[in-house]
Amino acid sequence: MARRILVTSALPYANGPIHLGHLVEYIQTDIWARFQRLRGNECYYVCADDAHGTPIMLKARERGVDPEQLIEEMAASHQADFADFLIGFDRYHSTHSAENRHFAELIYQRLEAGGHIERHTIEQLYDPGEGMFLPDRYIKGTCPRCAAPDQYGDSCEACGATYTPAELQDPVSVISGERPEVRESEHFFFRLQDFEALLRQWASAEHLQPEIINKLNEWFEAGLRDWDISRDAPYFGFRIPGTEDKYFYVWLDAPIGYMASFRRLAEERGIDFDAFWDAGRAEETELYHFIGKDIAYFHTLFWPAMLHGAGYRTPTAVYCHGFLTVNGQKMSKSRGTFITARSYLDHLDPEYLRYYTAAKLSDSVEDIDLSFDDFVQRVNSDVVGKLVNIASRCAGFITKRFDGRLAPRLSAPELFRTFTASAERIAELYEQREYARAVREIMHLADQANQYIDAEKPWERIKDPEQARAVQEICTMGLNLFRVLIIYIKPIMPRLAEDAEAFLAIGPLAWADVQAPLLDHGINKFKPLKTRIDPQQVEAVVDASKETLAQSESSEPAQGPSGRLAEDPIDEPITIDDFAKLDLRVAEVRVAEAVEGADKLLRLELDLGGETRQVFAGVRQAYSPEQLVGKRVVCVANLKPRKMRFGTSEGMVLCAGPGGEDLWVVGPDEGAEPGMRVK
C-alpha cells in the first residue's frame, strides 16, 4: 500500500538571495521527496518564504518600498533559483498569506483557551526617535563585563559574556544612533513547560537523530522556559487577536507556514488536508520536516508543543543537517566562497552540485565541505567518466550497425541480476537519508558496468562480421545496466534521467522498472548527456561572487586607511611592558559544546600542557563544536577568571575578524605543542 507523506524544508528568510548554504537542505529534501514518488508513494513537498519580522520591515524602509513589495521581489527571486536547481516543490507559498494568518490565529486561540498563554510585563529598550522597541540585535554599546565597545545587546563577542540589553553600558540604537530608554511592555508567553511530558515522550521515540535527542535532554535538564511569542508595534507581521499593538513573533507563524502552504496545495488539488494534520488521523499519513541543526530548538520543542496544544498531530520525524563549509572554511564573501545560487547557475550545471551534495550527505548533523578541487574531480570522474560513459561507449554501435535496435536478449543476465538485486539496499539508503552511501553503491555498480565493457571489447569484435550479434547483445547489456543506474540516480539527477529516457525512447522511469530489461527496442541517436567541468568555470563562480560583494560596497573613494584598517583602525600604541603582561599559550581544544541560552557561546575545555581550563568563547556563530575539537588555539592564560551565569571562564581564546559568522580562531603553526608560550 502506498504511503501518504508530507515533506517540508525550513522557510528561507525573505530579505536576501538563496546561497549554496541554503541549497544543502533543499537538495537533501528534494532528493528524498523524489525518491518517495519514484517508489510509488503519494508524497507532497511544500515550502514558503518566511516573510515577517523587524529585519524585513527595516530593509524595506531602507529601500523606500513597502514590506509587501520587498517580499514579493524576494519570492520571485527565490522561486526562480529553486526551479533552476530542480527543487520540485508541489507548492511554494508565503507566511504573509491569508492561510497563514488563519492558522496562526486559530492555533493561538486554541492555546489561549487551553490555558497555555500568559501575559507578563517586561522591560525593554525603546528608541524614542524611531518610536519602537529594539530587538537585541538592534542595540549596541559597551560590554558590562570587559568594557569592549560596539557589542550587541545580548552578548559580547570579545569576552563571550551574556547579559540583558538593560545591562549594556552606553547603549545606542543601531537604527537611529540615539540612546534608547528603558520602558515596560506587556508581552504574551507560551507555557512550554505544560508540554514537558509530551515532549519527553516524543523525543524518546524514533522521531529524531541521536545527536538531537541528546541536545533535547540537555534542554530538559536545564528546565523549559516560557516562550515570548509577541512583539510590539511597529512590526511587520500578524496582529495578535484582541490587541491593537501586539504582533506574533516571527518564529510563531513561520513553522505554521508549513500548514498554510499545504492548505493552499490541498485546495488546488482536492487533497484531504485534515488527513495530514488532524491529531486523530495521524496514523493515516506521515509528516517530515527537514531543517538545519541551528533551528532544532524551535522545531523540536515549541513546534510539536504548539501543534499538540492546538489539536494537531506532531511530526513523524524532524531531520537535521549540518552546515556547508567551502574549502574547509565557513563561507566568506571576501574569499568569494559566499556563493549565491544565481552566481553558480550562471556558470555551472545545477545537477553537478546536486550530485556532489548527495555524495557528501548522511543521516548526521555533521557539517559537509564543498572542496572545489574535489568537486571538479568527483563530477568529472563519477558522472562523466563512469556513469554517462557507459551509454557513450555502447550507443554508437547500436545506432550505426543495428539501426538503433536493441538485441532481444542480454549477454550477461547474471550481471544484470546483480544490478537489480541492489535496488532494495539502495532504496533503504535513500530512505534513511544516507545519500553518500547510496552514491558509493551506484558508482561501484558503474565501475562494474565499465569493467564488463572493457572485458568484452565491442570495438574489436565489431571488426569480425560473425560477431555482430554478440556486439549487439553486449551493447544492449551495457545500455540496460546504464538504464538501471539512471533509475538509481534519478532522485539526485532528474534532468539527466529525463535526457536518458529521451535517448532510450522510453517514458518516465519508476523504481520498479529496474527488474525488467529493455529488449528488442528502438533507441534514439546518442547525444552527450553531460560534459566535464573546466576548473575555469569554478574560478568564474568565485570571481563573480567577489564582484557581487564589491558592487554592494560603497563606491566612495577611500580617504586615509583603506580595507580592514578603515573599518577598524589600529588602537593607541602600547609599550613592550604592556604586552609582556599577557601570558599567551598554545592550547588544544579537548571538549567543545554549545551553551544553552547563549546563541554565541561555546564552552571549551582547553589542554594547556598539564592543566585543563574551561573557557566560554563567543564563536558559536562561526564554528560548530565538532570543528573545534582537536584544534590548537592561542589562549590568554593569565586572564583573571570571570564568573558567568553558565560557569566560570578561565581564559580567552584569540580570534580574528569583526565577529558573528565572520570570525576565525587564531592557531599556531604545525609543531607548536600545548603549553608553549606565544611571544
From Swiss-Prot:
Motif 'HIGH' region, residue range(s) on this chain: 12-22
Pfam family, one: Anticodon_3
Residue ranges, compositional bias (Polar residues): 548-557
Annotated compartments: Cytoplasm
Record-annotated tRNA-binding domain positions: 578-679
Residues where Zn(2+) binds: 143, 146, 156, 159
Disordered, as annotated region: 545-569
GO molecular function, one term: tRNA binding
Keyword Protein biosynthesis included in the entry's annotation: yes
Catalytic activity: tRNA(Met) + L-methionine + ATP = L-methionyl-tRNA(Met) + AMP + diphosphate
Keyword Disulfide bond: no
Subunit structure: Homodimer.
PANTHER family per UniProt: METHIONINE--TRNA LIGASE (PTHR45765), METHIONINE--TRNA LIGASE, CYTOPLASMIC (PTHR45765:SF1)
Name of the molecule in the record: Methionine--tRNA ligase
